[in-house]
Amino acid sequence: MKIGFDNEKYLKIQSEHIKERIAQFDGKLYMELGGKLFDDHHASRVLPGFKPDSKLRMLGQLRDSIEIVIVVNAEDIEKNKVRADLCITYDEDVHRLRDEFMSRNFMVGSVVITHYNGQHAADQFRHRLEREGIKSYVHYPIDGYPHNVELIASDEGFGKNDYVETSRPLVIVTAPGPGSGKMATCLSQLYNENKRGIRAGYAKFETFPVWNLPLKHPVNIAYEAATADLNDVNMIDPFHLEAYNKTAVNYNRDIEIFPVLNALIEGIYGENPYKSPTDMGVNMIGFCISDDEVCCKASKDEIIRRFYDATNKMADGADNESEVNKIRMLFNQAKITTAFRPVTTAAYEKKLETGQQAAAIELEDGTIITAKSTPLLGCSAALLLNATKHLAEIDHQTKLIPQSLIEPVQKTKIEYLGGKNPRLHTDEVLVALSVLSNNDERSAPGDALLAENCRKALEQLPKLRGCQIHTTVMLSEVDRKIFKKLGCGLTCDPVKKK
């Protein structure tokens, strides 16, 4: 995989910048955490070289200064709101987040239940936290929030909320999902800290959009594609332009809320040290791009991947036409079509040539490998074999998995397990290669050669990380998961298997 991002530089300058921001205030900073922390695969795809856990590793350098506060909305607890990606309720996710942080030796100080209005489920949740020895606090709804600044920044507004006791200079405020009340919790703490004579600060830690890249830079367009279902829009920050006569990129929701946020901070302190929403951020990721061309290509690939992801959801019955149309519009901004990815064209051509569903992969050196569906193998499984054989310099005509082994597996799938598709999936191919790679001294010469070839093929799997793949048919969840684990950028035509 070609590298376009200096991860070590990021770990260094991002942690230093956060320290500088803490020092600007009375040694106390409340930092609202946006985006993914544990597994930011989007960032790792558009910025090759960025590790999915880079932000967590960066915060690890500040571990002794960090205290984490997890925020959850009482209304979400009452409604049993579920995280779609994890299929767990928000209250369960509070425990998951706490366990994740603590397993990495971060201090989790407490849980704040926002929008509390006597909800029974919230009371039960709080009792559970108490039994487990976890501190909890409640924050109440405020009439006219966020516009009634006079009430909000008073003892009848933020002053009614529990004061969250913290002991470390950097308080990271995170939550199971949007709408939990992270920003309001930070501002409430600023008000209550100020009453106690501490001039604490507020900052936002979000990765995208990248403020110091051009508005139409592919990295920023890829962020819009990733949030097309939310209809987020990247914009030039007008407040930053007015204050400094410099362009900076932000997104519509932060720009829209800034006048309100500005008024609230002025209501607490009498003045706001930030002139723009961009000022509030601490993101240094744009300074760590080491090869812009690599990141531009990766981001364009990601825009196309998001398009196919959206069209696949539509093929499965989702009502997401607006999401698909939004990404089509982003194609124009990025000046690309699906043909930008050579694998897309190669897979189509293979399908036209053979009359079968097909797949293609682009290896790191630019070589394109293709495969088609056969009575024995699905196109994705065949592609995995063809690619690893090429990388291992095994003759293309050499059969790694004998038909005599495949046919009994197919019989089991159809006759005993009631399946409809006899072809082997990618996971079954990998298991077969693993079994066949085992060799002992009693093996016949032909078996020994087969075992050696299977071993050599398996050893090539790490070389597939970062490679782009396209198939002309929607793959099963099993195949999708295998390619995800291998680190491949997979797209599929919105065509369901018959």
Model-derived segments and their meaning:
Residues 1-172, 189-348, 356, 363-365, ...:
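Flexible phosphate-sensing "switch/lid" loops adjacent to ATP/NTP-binding sites
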Residues 174-176:
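Residues at the beta-strand->loop junction immediately N-terminal to the Walker
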Residues 185:
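Hydrophobic positions on the alpha1 helix immediately C-terminal to the Walker A/P-loop
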Residues 196-200, 393-399:
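Phosphate-handling active-site elements
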Residues 201, 373-374:
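Residue-level structural signal for beta-strand termini and adjacent loop
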Residues 376-392:
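A short, polar/charged loop-to-alpha-helix boundary motif
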Residues 395-407, 411-428:
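Substrate-recognition/cap regions that form aromatic- and gly/pro-loop-enriched pockets
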